[in-house]
């Protein structure tokens, strides 16, 4: 009779719930074997669920490939709401049928997974572009217009010219066919890829600013108006990266 460890090792090779070995192993009544079977079944089901989720997130891209578009760029931004720092946009062109496990709206990805998924996007993407508009531009033109400028800059930095754009809840005045998708980062894999690139890029910038302007907790709050950030403003005042048209900073200048 095989040991429990040997059966566990064999189960690790099973990738299909219909694999005959699962039924065969189920005849072994040892609790260690039964637990190992259930664990492996859960893992296989999780893989199937993840593949289905990713397949759903490719539905926009697949329709466009059918319409003979070849280079589809997903575009998203991070940083519209913070009191400090830039708004960062990214544009990403993924190859057809590209599925990156765990890729989702960056707000739904655990922080400990950000770097890993960001790197997977960089490794698999056909092209990646990043655009940034600092707080001074945000104050000059407003955050909505600055976001569009950042997206257009990200688009201009792609090494491959896209023939279609999928954009998260935004329209751009560029001469490329496009679709604006509400909650696009949760519904399109290309937009989700842009979301994580923009998120990791901006978080790194804010961590660097935290060293330059200590006392505001930028590395943790990314410039959002958390208690520690507001306490820093009360204690030390406004830094050169704060948005002067955003409250409560605006009132400090009146």
Swiss-Prot record:
One of the protein's GO biological processes: DNA replication, removal of RNA primer
Keyword check for Protease: no
Chief localization: cytoplasm
GO cellular component, as recorded: cytoplasm; ribonuclease H2 complex
EC number, UniProt record: 3.1.26.4
Reactions the enzyme catalyzes: Endonucleolytic cleavage to 5'-phosphomonoester
Cofactor note: Manganese or magnesium. Binds 1 divalent metal ion per monomer in the absence of substrate. May bind a second metal ion after substrate binding.
InterPro entries to which the protein is assigned, alphabetical: RNase_HII (IPR022898), RNase_HII/HIII (IPR001352), RNase_HII/HIII_dom (IPR024567), RNaseH-like_sf (IPR012337), RNaseH_sf (IPR036397)
Localisation: Cytoplasm
Protein origin, superkingdom: Bacteria
GO MF annotations in UniProt: manganese ion binding; RNA binding; RNA-DNA hybrid ribonuclease activity
This protein's UniProt keywords: Cytoplasm, Endonuclease, Hydrolase, Manganese, Metal-binding, Nuclease
Gene3D superfamilies: Ribonuclease H-like superfamily/Ribonuclease H (3.30.420.10)
Task performed by this protein: Endonuclease that specifically degrades the RNA of RNA-DNA hybrids.
Protein family membership: Belongs to the RNase HII family.
Protein name: Ribonuclease HII
Organism annotation: Streptococcus sanguinis (strain SK36)
């Amino acid at each position: 009779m095989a040991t429990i460890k040997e059966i566990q090792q064999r189960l690790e090779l099973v990738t299909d719930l219909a694999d005959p070995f699962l039924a065969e192993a189920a005849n072994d009544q040892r609790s260690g074997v039964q637990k190992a079977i259930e664990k492996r079944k859960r893992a296989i089901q999780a893989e199937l669920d993840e593949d289905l989720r990713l397949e759903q997130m490719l539905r926009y891209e697949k329709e466009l490939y059918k319409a003979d578009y070849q280079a589809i760029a997903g575009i998203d931004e991070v940083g519209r709401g913070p009191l400090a720092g830039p708004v960062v946009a990214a544009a990403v062109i993924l190859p057809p049928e590209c599925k990156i496990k765990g890729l989702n709206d960056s707000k739904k990805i655990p922080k400990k997974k950000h770097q890993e998924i960001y790197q997977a996007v960089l490794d698999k993407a056909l092209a990646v572009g990043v655009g940034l508009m600092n707080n001074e531009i945000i104050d000059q033109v407003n955050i909505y217009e600055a976001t569009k400028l950042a997206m257009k800059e990200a688009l201009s930095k792609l090494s491959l010219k896209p023939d279609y754009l999928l954009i998260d809840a935004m329209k751009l005045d560029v001469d490329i066919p496009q679709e604006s998708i509400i909650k696009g980062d949760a519904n399109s894999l290309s937009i989700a890829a842009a979301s994580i690139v923009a998120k990791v890029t901006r978080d790194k910038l804010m961590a660097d600013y935290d060293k330059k302007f200590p006392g505001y907790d930028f590395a943790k709050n990314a410039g959002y108006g958390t208690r520690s950030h507001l306490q820093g403003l009360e204690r030390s005042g406004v830094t050169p990266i704060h948005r002067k048209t955003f409250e409560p900073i605006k009132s400090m200048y009146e």
